[in-house]
């Protein structure tokens, strides 16, 4: 249920702040959002898959923590990121 290498590379290229940037909060949140969106279809087909649902909730929690960190660090970057990703915040 993970993303393939080409998809990850495209996301990193779109959200990186510089060359070789894979660890910035923007990149991490974008990758988590793509994984979360990818799992949505799986859960529509497999409603009883509670083991994977726990992993999904971990991803959502990690994304929230990264967004909270970014919001406290740089509000403009935070607002730009949630607008680009289409998150409801």
UniProtKB/Swiss-Prot annotation:
InterPro entries: Ribosomal_uS15, Ribosomal_uS15_bac-type, uS15_NS1_RNA-bd_sf. GO terms for biological process: translation. GO terms for cellular component: cytosolic small ribosomal subunit. Pfam families: Ribosomal_S15 (PF00312). The keyword Transferase does not apply. The keyword Ribosomal protein applies. Keywords: Ribonucleoprotein, Ribosomal protein, RNA-binding, rRNA-binding. GO terms for molecular function: rRNA binding; structural constituent of ribosome. SUPFAM superfamilies: S15/NS1 RNA-binding domain. Part of the 30S ribosomal subunit. Forms a bridge to the 50S subunit in the 70S ribosome, contacting the 23S rRNA. PANTHER family: RIBOSOMAL PROTEIN S15, BACTERIAL AND ORGANELLAR, SMALL RIBOSOMAL SUBUNIT PROTEIN US15M. One of the primary rRNA binding proteins, it binds directly to 16S rRNA where it helps nucleate assembly of the platform of the 30S subunit by binding and bridging several RNA helices of the 16S rRNA. Forms an intersubunit bridge (bridge B4) with the 23S rRNA of the 50S subunit in the ribosome. Belongs to the universal ribosomal protein uS15 family. This is Small ribosomal subunit protein uS15. It comes from Vibrio vulnificus (strain YJ016). The gene is rpsO.
